[in-house]
Amino acid sequence: MEKSDRELIKESYDHLKISCNFLSDEYEYEFESPSTEEEINNWEKENNIELPSMLKEWFLLTKNCNMSNRMWRIFWPKVDKTDSVLIGSFIGDGEFLFFSKESGEFFTTFEGEVEEYDSFDSVLTYISIDLEEKAEEIFGEDWTDIYDDKFGED
């Protein structure tokens, strides 16, 4: 049986939060309080834009988050003058995460280049892979054993 958007996003959220905790001696992180259904509904009405389902589920877990010393940021949506809504920044070097107002598709832009993602969960997977690479740099090839000892196996 296929998982719901809520289940997929909750799993990704939990994994990212645990991964950030695992790396917390080297990298700061913050997951702020969640938004409410009412805040989400009000934002959608005020902006006449429907947030993609997975993004709504994310905001019901955290309204803003900074991972890996602000390298990965996902924040409350900001409408720009284009056909896109800004929801994050990557690396801190000018790469920004958006979703299309029309299609709801997620993409990043950097120096005029566009990288598309299948879903918001794919964005979170991309971040997760980076955090796992950081764990290997810090703890070595056996980082998963240390992770499992500390947090239990997934």
What are these regions (language model features)?
Residues 131-154:
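Acidic, proline/glycine-rich low-complexity IDRs
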Residues 36, 62, 82, 108-109, ...:
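Residue-identity detector for threonine
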Residues 95-97, 107-108, 116-118:
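Short helix/loop capping segments that flank catalytic or ligand/cofactor-binding pockets
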